[in-house]
Design a protein with these regions (language model features):
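Carboxylate-rich helix-loop segments that flank metal/cofactor sites and access channels
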Residues: 68, 78, 83-93
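Short amphipathic alpha-helical interaction elements located at domain edges
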Residues: 142, 153-166
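Amphipathic alpha-helical recognition patches that constitute DNA-binding helices
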Residues: 24-28, 55, 105, 131
Length: 166
């Protein structure tokens, strides 16, 4: 099968109302997700973190949990979480300690460097989020965030990050 080439008469993507996919919610959400993700990833890259690594650090900064509990809270599957914690451990941001109640279980803990990096990452992530959302009128922004929250903690509350098989 040959390479697909877009038609030369395709409209620019910035013609929102007239774009052929302007009523496709999945496509729209994907574009927003990609835009947020690209900006956040670029900001976190300066701190030598991925978005997923920041999510794990952020959860660890808030709760004392086993690795299994951490995965459930962050909605990251076991394989992806193991890879993420391995990376954070190599960077000196996390250590794994045996759970005193179950020696088979591990409790990831932030190192002092991990705590500092998490705080910095949270600041830059919030700045990126605010820069993006500040482009919306306040009432629209509140409705947008409220609607996302309803979906995230409602019908998509069990959605999980899955390890990429590459």
């Amino acid at each position: 099968m040959g390479t697909m080439v877009p038609p030369t008469d395709a409209p620019p993507l910035d013609e929102a109302a007239d774009h052929v996919l302007s009523d496709d919610v999945n496509w729209l959400l994907n574009r927003v997700w990609l835009g947020f993700g690209e900006r956040r990833a670029a900001a976190l890259d300066a701190l030598d973190l991925t978005v997923r690594e920041h999510v794990v650090l952020d959860v660890l900064s808030r709760v004392d949990a086993t690795q299994l509990q951490l995965g459930a809270i962050a909605r990251i599957d076991k394989s992806a979480l193991t890879l993420t914690i391995d990376s954070l451990e190599r960077k000196g941001l996390v250590v794994r300690e045996p759970d005193p109640r179950d020696r088979r279980a591990k409790r990831p803990r932030l190192t002092p460097l991990g705590r500092d990096r998490c705080a910095a990452a949270s600041r830059v992530s919030r700045q990126v989020q605010d820069q993006i959302l500040d482009s919306l009128p306040k009432a629209t922004r509140e409705i947008f965030v409220s609607t996302l929250r309803e979906y995230a903690f409602g019908q998509f509350s069990q959605a999980t990050y899955v390890a990429q098989s590459r």
